[in-house]
UniProtKB/Swiss-Prot annotation:
Compartments (UniProt record): Mitochondrion inner membrane
One GO term describing the cellular component: mitochondrial inner membrane
Organism per entry: Akodon mimus
Keyword Transmembrane helix: yes
Protein name: Cytochrome b
Amino acid sequence: MKILRKNHPLLKIVNHSFIDLPTPSNISSWWNFGSLLGACLMIQILTGLFLAMHYTSDTTTAFSSVAHICRDVNYGWLIRYLHANGASMFFICLFIHVGRGIYYGSYALSETWNIGIILFLTTMATAFVGYVLPWGQMSFWGATVITNLLSAIPYIGSTLVEWIWGGFSVDKATLTRFFAFHFILPFIIAALALVHLLFLHETGSNNPSGLNSDSDKIPFHPYYTIKDLLGIFLLLMALMILALFFPDLLGDPDNYTPANPLNTPAHIXPXXXXXFAYAILRSIPNKLGGVLALILSILILATFPLLNTSKQHGLIXRPVTQTIYWIFIANLLVLTWIGGQPVEYPFTMIGQIASISYFTIIIILMPLSNTIENNIIKL
């Protein structure tokens, strides 16, 4: 068997990626989230496949087909709630994974980092088109509001929006194409994840110390396969608790009302996962400015390798940048909270302050703290 896994053309790839892969001996549980994201993706593809067997992407029957899945299909309610809450768990793991990358300086592996940003954007797009499918009030109005943002693009905006809608409003054509996108995108994510892994294995994993770990590597199996399995077990436990005890905790009650183009909900809040980006969008009064800020809030992650001037790798022994990092995380949580609040006096102001802080911390404060720490080292 040992010879087979090292010589067989297919098994050799698996062997180099998951069995004999040289891995730093000191990577902590923060490194588990990559495998957890893989597990989430598999759960989403499997539950999604079973949902797609019973779902109909037609405006007249979409809402009732989801109700039919929950009421009449064997364990349909479980599959539906695992899929909906699985998406939330996916994003929680994704945010922690990116946060770990920033904290430990994993952005130094620029190819892996950039593919990661593309994966992040693709996942957000998948979640958005998926949110439209149940065809409830929030699905319909969320689709209308978010697709309408493209009309802010000069000259081609209005044409582009109508092209995406397939008509003059969000209707049957929109729902059908969104279902098609929602079906194909997870497979594109899976392919991109393989490219992400390919680039990672070219350089090897980073580690908490930020030092070169070539002198102290251990095989991935059995050490990290067991560690990853424990992480996956805990993830499944959390997902089951969420899906069985609090299935609607992260959803919106408005989505239990069928879509009605004549009745607008009191306030349109996106899915909990994209709330921070939505808060940044809303904090700018100008439409085009808001759209640009929304896109930049994600793309700004690509500046981390460029703006990093520190002589040390990661934040493990950098107290100034560590403090700024945790302020940044707190700021992100504030933005997430604001994204789900109505557009009223205290919330709009808090949102604007938090949005300015978000960009200021990344573009100004972090590079500044790098310079300060470099000068302290010289003393």
